[in-house]
Every structure is written in structure tokens, then in C-alpha cells.
């Protein structure tokens, strides 16, 4: 897993986080407790900081990039960022789910419990109210979530994190925050048996 220092800032990864050896973290990145980062994700904090809150899962091929000093990325707790999402700068509260292939541009504010549906685009500077389900290019509200929906979102995020705790217990050579490639291959072979 490439962890690259940039302008004197090196990624800060909690020993209780799980980061794939096939992901890349650059610069001022903070990965908090129980975060899971899957293979192929690129997290580049070269111009501004990136903070990933507890129990958040970053799926395969996610791209986070701070293009300017005004494009910091803050992801709340219990969030799920699905495969192929691009984040170019946003403030995201807790219990948010960003579905596959979505692009979020700079200076976006996303409220608690929001879901953004597959292949949507969120234009720069948009504020999305809490518990809203959004879809489209550009995004538009399609419905509201209940408090119960948001609690289910939290449970789903916890389940993803707990899955990696179980996996880590099965891997004798796993480091505190890194699943090595040989251990990852062993795990995949074990599942096929």
C-alpha cells in the first residue's frame, strides 16, 4: 500500500482501520478507527485535508482528490462510499451513502442520513438537506428518509466494519492496519473452499 508523504504531511492511519495494500494514500489524510478502505482506492490530500470518520467504508476504485485549498473532504461517521465514486471536495455528515459511479464536486455540504443514488452528479456548492435521497445529473430530491432508515444505514456501516474485524482475526500475518496481499489471496482462496 503506497502511503506517500506530500509537503511534509503523511497519512495518519488508526491502528484499528483496515486499508487494502492495493490502495494509495497521499498527503494530509486522516483515517479514523474502524474505517475500511478497499483495493484500488486513491485518496489524495495534496492541497487540503481529507478526514474519514469512524466506521466508514470506502469501496473499490473510489477517488478522493483535493484540487485546491478550498476543496477539503470531511466524511462523517458510519458512511458508505461505494465503488467508483469521485469526491473532489465536500463536507459529509454521519450515516451518508454515496452509491456507485457518483461524482461530487467542490464545496458540497451533505446532511446526515443522505443517500445519493448511482451515477449521479452533485454540482459545486450544493447543500443537500439531512435525510434526503438524491438522484440524477444534476441531482434532485426524489424522497425523504425516516429516522429508522438512517438507523438502518448506521447498522449497515457497522456490519461492513465488523466483517473486516472477523477477516483480520483469521489472518495470522495481518498488520494492525494493513491486509497484506498474500493474506488477502489466502482469504479469497479460503472462501472458495
What name fits each language-model region?
Residues 1-8, 12, 46, 52-54, ...:
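Glycine-rich hexapeptide-repeat left-handed beta-helix
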Residues 13-67:
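A positional/architectural concept
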Residues 80:
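Short proline/glycine- and basic residue-enriched helix-capping loop/turn segments at helix->loop/beta transitions
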Amino acid at each position: 500500500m503506497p502511503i506517500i508523504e506530500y509537503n511534509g504531511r503523511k497519512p495518519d492511519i488508526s491502528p484499528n482501520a483496515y486499508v487494502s495494500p492495493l490502495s494509495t494514500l497521499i498527503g494530509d489524510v486522516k483515517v479514523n478507527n474502524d474505517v475500511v478502505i478497499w483495493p484500488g482506492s486513491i485518496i489524495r490530500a495534496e492541497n487540503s485535508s481529507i478526514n474519514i470518520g469512524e466506521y466508514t467504508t470506502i469501496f473499490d476504485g473510489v477517488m478522493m482528490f483535493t484540487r485546491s485549498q478550498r476543496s477539503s473532504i470531511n466524511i462523517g461517521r458510519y458512511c458508505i462510499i461505494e465503488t467508483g465514486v469521485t469526491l473532489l471536495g465536500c463536507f459529509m455528515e454521519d450515516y451518508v451513502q454515496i452509491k456507485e459511479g457518483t461524482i461530487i464536486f467542490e464545496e458540497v455540504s451533505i446532511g446526515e442520513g443522505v443517500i445519493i443514488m448511482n451515477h449521479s452528479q452533485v454540482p459545486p456548492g450544493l447543500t443537500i438537506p439531512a435525510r434526503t435521497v438524491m438522484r440524477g445529473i444534476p441531482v434532485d430530491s426524489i424522497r425523504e428518509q425516516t429516522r429508522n432508515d438512517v438507523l438502518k444505514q448506521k447498522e449497515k456501516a457497522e456490519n461492513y466494519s465488523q466483517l473486516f474485524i472477523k477477516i483480520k482475526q483469521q489472518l495470522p500475518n495481518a498488520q494492525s492496519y494493513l491486509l497484506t496481499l498474500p493474506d488477502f489471496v489466502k482469504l479469497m482462496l479460503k472462501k472458495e473452499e
